[in-house]
Amino acid sequence: MALRGIPRLASLPTAIGNWAEQLDKAAPGVLTWLQDFFASVFREFKDLRSRVGALESASVATTNTTTYTSTGAFTHTWSANAVGAWVTVVAGGGGGVGQASGAGGGGGGGSGQIVGPVWFDRNSASTTSGSVGVGGTGAASPSATAGGNSTFGNLTAVGGETTTGGTGGVGGAPSGITAPTGGTSGAAGGNGSNCAAIGAWSTSGAAGGGGGTANAGGNGGVSPTGQPGGTGGTGNGTQGGGGGGGGGWDGPGGAGGNGAATFPNTPTAPTAKGAGGGGAGETSGGAGVGANGAPGIVVVQEVLE
């Protein structure tokens, strides 16, 4: 019986000798078939090797990343062979608040909106304008400010909000979108709401925690990148802690200040991009001052051809 063109061997050689001669006698023509078969295999491997070599030498897409961290306007100059870029836009975080003596801990600031990474087509442009949003100013109520917007071309991320009392600031979100709500003020401050998805490539900022009127302040909400909000400051049963700021792009929000009979009750100004500032803890010695929110960032990862 033949198997795919190989004749059945009538009798196999049993002693070492001229195997080729014995095999040819046992199955006439099989040597020629084997030679043709292995020659074909060799040709296929040779062709495969040349194809792999061609793939290895072929050019692949490379990237060129530029990061903008200085607040204010900038101009991005495209690389000559860039076709577009993956862009991430992070807005500034809102400043935390301090309240008057006896009013409780201040609310933490909300973190800035995050847009991207999203594909931005170059469309033959030589430059594209953008801006990095400032962090909001932490202050005694009602003087704290919201974080600034960040932009790149037609992309805009909205800054996190501040507050005027013990309630945490809302997370940054565009007009018409319900932003995550700040934690409520109470004996113990409520936690700020986590970020919320806006679309396939955009997410709101996280809200700040509420200040406590006697006990701990609430934590800030979790950011789109999974960063935790700042922890609320501790209270002492009389003076409440400040609320934590909303979580940022690359780190946590600012921690709230601790409630205390005397100063300091200083909250934390975060370093994470777009994070909200912590709210001041309550004291009997005067109004507290909230911490600044963190500025935003714009990352442009060009794809080159």
Give residue spans per PLM region:
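Extracellular "spike/adhesin" assembly and maturation modules
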Residues: 1-49
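Glycine-rich, low-complexity segments
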Residues: 39-70, 211, 222
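Short beta-strand/loop motifs in extracellular/secreted proteins, especially
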Residues: 83-85
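Secretome/extracellular-domain signature
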Residues: 96-104, 109-230
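Short Lys/Arg-enriched alpha/beta "domain-start" segment
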Residues: 237-242
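Ser/Thr/Pro-rich, low-complexity mucin-like regions
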Residues: 302-305
